[in-house]
Amino acid sequence: MNKFRTFPQINTLIQDESLKSYPFYIKAFFCKKVVAKLKENFSRDEISKDKLLLEIKKEIKTFYRKDLQSVINASGVVIHTNLGRSVIHEELYEACKDIICNYSNVEFDLENGKRGSRYALVLEKLKMLFECEDALVVNNNAAAVFLVLNSLCYDKEVISSRGELVEIGGSFRVPEVIKAAGVKLCEVGTSNKTHLKDYEQAINENTALILKTHKSNFALMGFHSEVNIKDLHELVKEKGLLSYYDLGSGWCENLNEKLIKNEPKIKKLVQECDILSFSGDKLFGSVQAGIILGKKELIGKLKQNQLLRMLRVDKLTLSFLNESLKAYLQKDYEKIITLKLLNDDLSFIEEKALRVQKELKFQTQLKKSKSLVGGGSMPDKSLDTYILTFQGDALKLQTRFRKENIIGRIENDEFVLDFRTIRENELQKLILKINQMENL
């Protein structure tokens, strides 16, 4: 006897009038999913068609809700990895729109009618901005680290300080990336102290490179020391080896002076090592990309690696990166939104908060607070900001606002909106969304 004989037929559910407005493939998928789930957790209770349809509609609504959507970042974390890190300026998007929506010369030389290099679009601008010999772009900085090590150190040894063997988001660890690249890791020093002699004593006939990794997502305080890349580079030159700086983040131009102390500047560092890499969507404020700068001979080896085909970027990334580079070269820093948010004056942030507070139908309090840089950058630094606090259960309020795509935070048991990360062009939308809520 078929124990599922009481279940409505899939076709009957798909053809039900209440699902008529949904595309066939979507409703067919969720009808099958819901029925399979109920069969898995089978009980002898009667399964009604109405109950199944209710569950199917719930699943479909959740599915549509899961689409990528714009949100208002009121968290106070400027480079928020879970919210897409850096934001692209509308004018940069408009400049790229024609390329993205049409065929383009991404790998075609319009001068001679032959195949061209996809990197040509950004190569000259990178060399100009950072004063480096050569450059390359891959899909993120983890890919850059992998490509550099695999191209320059395969089956050889790389030396790294124990204090710099970091773990980045999603449990990706530098030692595991090194291993996956086909390179042997030699750890030197301790978690809090590493000296130049530690590197020197570890060099052997199989050593290819000394790796320095910037501690961008944590801060080491108290009794500690590390060797700067300039001194490491002097050592490798003497020994006939290579130096590589995995910068991760790093800044380029026009960054808030409160943040730049002890934070490496890319243009300076590229002169102090053989090769370095950093993320395009962190402090640089552009799209996700791994940007590699260095000696022409070394970048040439990276370009010959067959893995580059798997790690290359597409026309969207190249288009947006190209426009970001143009903004930097023209010193049009207002178009680099990450820089603008980090540099915004406290009085401007207060003005934004007051404009919203004045229009809200709910009672709020204006307070001073601190914002974070985020994105695994500058963990020991914060920026002054203004917040609005809301009365009520903080967790319930956080959930309620999240349903309206407003991402705030809880601070001192209060739900707050941080106005450093709320852009001026979002203020009216924010007011409208909050005022449409019935009760908080």
UniProtKB/Swiss-Prot annotation:
Its EC number is 2.9.1.1. It catalyses: L-seryl-tRNA(Sec) + selenophosphate + H(+) = L-selenocysteinyl-tRNA(Sec) + phosphate. One of its GO terms (biological process) is conversion of seryl-tRNAsec to selenocys-tRNAsec. Pathway: Aminoacyl-tRNA biosynthesis; selenocysteinyl-tRNA(Sec) biosynthesis; selenocysteinyl-tRNA(Sec) from L-seryl-tRNA(Sec) (bacterial route): step 1/1. Its cofactor is pyridoxal 5'-phosphate. It is an enzyme of class 2 (transferase). GO terms for cellular component: cytoplasm. It comes from the Bacteria. Keywords: Cytoplasm, Protein biosynthesis, Pyridoxal phosphate, Selenium, Transferase. The modification N6-(pyridoxal phosphate)lysine is found at residue 282. Its main location: cytoplasm. It is found in: Cytoplasm. GO terms for molecular function: L-seryl-tRNA(Sec) selenium transferase activity. SUPFAM superfamilies: PLP-dependent transferases. It holds the Pfam family SelA. HAMAP family: SelA. Belongs to the SelA family. Converts seryl-tRNA(Sec) to selenocysteinyl-tRNA(Sec) required for selenoprotein biosynthesis. This is L-seryl-tRNA(Sec) selenium transferase. It comes from Campylobacter jejuni subsp. doylei (strain ATCC BAA-1458 / RM4099 / 269.97). The gene is selA.
